[in-house]
Amino acid sequence: MLWVDKYRPKTLDKVTVHDQVAQNLKKLVAEQDCPHLLFYGPSGSGKKTLVMALIKQMFGAGADKVKMENKTWKIDTGSRNIEIELAMLSSAHHVEMNPSDAGFQDRYVVQEVIKEMAKNRPIDAKGKRAFKVLVLNEVDKLSREAQHSLRRTMEKYSASCRLILCCNSSSKVTEAVRSRCLNVRVNAPSEDQIVQVLEFIGKKENLQLPFGFAARIAAQSNRNLRRAILFFETCKVQQYPFTSNQVAPPLDWEQYVSEIAADIMKEQSPKRLFAVRQKFYELLVNCIPPESILKKLLAELLKKLDSDLKHEICHWAAHYEHKMRLGSKAIFHLEAFVAKFMSIYKEFLVSTFG
C-alpha cells in the first residue's frame, strides 16, 4: 500500500492539517442536520480525506466497506436511448463518482444517479440517518447543462439524498449550485505542516531523515500534500539511507514541458511551432490535463523572461486557458498560446537588439 493511502486519516479526530475544519464538520454531524456540502480547494490539499472521514463519522464502520464497479446507465433522453458506462465507488451508505468523465452527456448521468439513489432510500429503522450520500468529484468540470440539472435534482430529492461536491475552483460552479450548499474551503497546507506530516511518516516507518530533507521535499511539492508524500516514498525506493543533498526526481511530464519551454525560447518559427505541437500531442495522449500543461509551460517561460514581458504573457495564458475550457480541442489553444508567445517574444528581441 502506498504511504499516501496508508497514512490517510480515517476519522475526523485524526485529521491534523485541517483540524479546525474537521471540528466544524463534527459539529454538523452531531446536530444530525447535515446540508449539501461543497468542498473546494487546490489539488492535494486534503478535500477527499475530509470527505471520507466525514462519511465515516456519519455512518460508522459500514462506510469503509467499499466496492468498485463499472456501471452502465441506460438513459432515455426523449429522442433516443443512450448507454453510458462510468466507474463508481459505493458502500451501503454512499456512492462516489466523477460524472464529468461522461463528457457532454454528463447531465444525464447526474439526473439518473440521483433518481436511482432516491428510489433506494435506506429504511430509518433505529433512528439511523434515512438518506444516502452522493459524492461528486470535479464538479467544476461539469457542463453548464449538467450543473443546472444538478441544481434541480438536488432540490427535488433533498429528503433522501445528500450531495457532497468536490472541486478545485468554486468560481467554475454556478451560483445556483453554490448557494444550495454549505461551502467548505480547504486551503493548501503550509510547508511547515507538510514537513510535520513527512516527519510523522518517517517516524512510523523508522526512517532517519537528514536535516532539511523534509523541508526540501515540501518546497518541491508546491504545497501539494499528496505529491509531497509520493515524492518522499519515491526517494525511499530510490536510495536509503537518505543523503544530505537528496531531492525527489521531477515528474517525467514536467521535465518534458521544461524541454518544450527551452525549445520555444531558442527559436521562434513555424518549424519550431510544428515541432512543439507534436510534443503537445504526446503529452495529451498520455492523459496529462491540458490545463496542467499550460500552467507548467507558463511557469517555465516566466523563469526565462524579461520582467517587462511577464504581465502580457500571463494575460495571454489566462486568455487561452479560458478559451480552452470553452472549447473541446485543447491542442488548438495550447498551440495558439505558443504562437502568440513566439510573436510577442520575437518582436521584443527585434526591438531590443535589432
From Swiss-Prot:
Distribution of this protein across tissues and organs: Expressed in roots, leaves, shoot apical meristem (SAM), flag leaves and panicles.
GO molecular-function terms, A-Z: ATP binding; ATP hydrolysis activity; DNA binding
InterPro entries for the chain: AAA+_ATPase, DNA_pol3_clamp-load_cplx_C, DNA_Rep/Repair_Clamp_Loader, P-loop_NTPase
Taxonomic superkingdom: Eukaryota
GO-annotated biological processes: DNA repair; DNA-templated DNA replication
Induction behaviour: Down-regulated by sucrose starvation.
Family: Belongs to the activator 1 small subunits family.
PANTHER family registered for this protein in UniProt: REPLICATION FACTOR C / DNA POLYMERASE III GAMMA-TAU SUBUNIT, REPLICATION FACTOR C SUBUNIT 3
Protein name: Replication factor C subunit 5
Organism: Oryza sativa subsp. japonica (Rice)
Organism ancestry: Eukaryota, Viridiplantae, Streptophyta, Embryophyta, Tracheophyta
